Amino acid sequence: MTVFRFKQQLYLSILLLICAQLLVTPSRITAQTPPAVDLVNQGLQLVQQGKLQQAIAAFAKAASLDPKLAPAHYNLGLALRQQEKLQPAADAFYQAILAEPQFALAYANLGAALLEGNNPQQAQAYLQKAIELEPNLGLAHYNLGLVKAQQQDWQGAIASYTTALKYSPDLPEISYHLGVVYRQQNEIEQAIIAFRRAIQLLPNYAEAHYNLGAIMFAQGQLQPALAAFRQAAQANSNYANAYYAAGLVFMRLGQHQEARRVLQDAKNLYAKQRNAQWEANTDQLLQQAR
């Protein structure tokens, strides 16, 4: 499962607005706040420069200087989450909520971190709180959809993804996961529409190409399926499933030499990824292609 992460630039634009609002709110200005805010802004610049560890240090120092400065905790959480440090990130988002109880984005990202840490029940509570505070927050609706999909509440997931699309129509991950649920529910035409929308938004969306190819393959449309699997592999050269699926198409077409070539690529990738089961499955298919 892929938990949604805003692109860094979008996060930064939101956070800069939040920081600006804090700077002009007299009730939030203390003797410590100006240097703390300076550190937050310094941290944001470091993130833009790709200096994540230095940014974390700046955000942490800002939070230490002014524990009530919510953007310091929030940015610290985002940076820690980029390093896949889920528990420290969740702790930072929680501190942001304590500092600013109406901070919907902090609730949404805390929910996302908890979901990524395999704690869907707590995640759902924080995501619902985010939506209560800010009903048009696409991030929260999207992650709530992921929770519902994990709970196999398929119609609930579709409803959450659809709402997320209403508020964040340009985010390809939402369309992709909507397509996944539609495909699981055998609503194939809706799945195709969703995957194509994801690809339109992000042409190199490997998983969307792959799922579209899988649908084409199941429908017996071998050439369109092969084209989709090729696009998936071009978008992500380490996508072993795309090579394996292309091998299945070549086998069905009777092009065994081509099948062996891509299946060997798939086997090598599965071995590199230490996926012994699929390495063995691919080896069996290779034997059939000889």
Can you annotate each of these PLM segments?
Residues Q49-K61, Q82-Q95, G117-K129, Q151-T163, ...:
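Structural signature of tandem alpha-helical TPR/SEL1-like repeats
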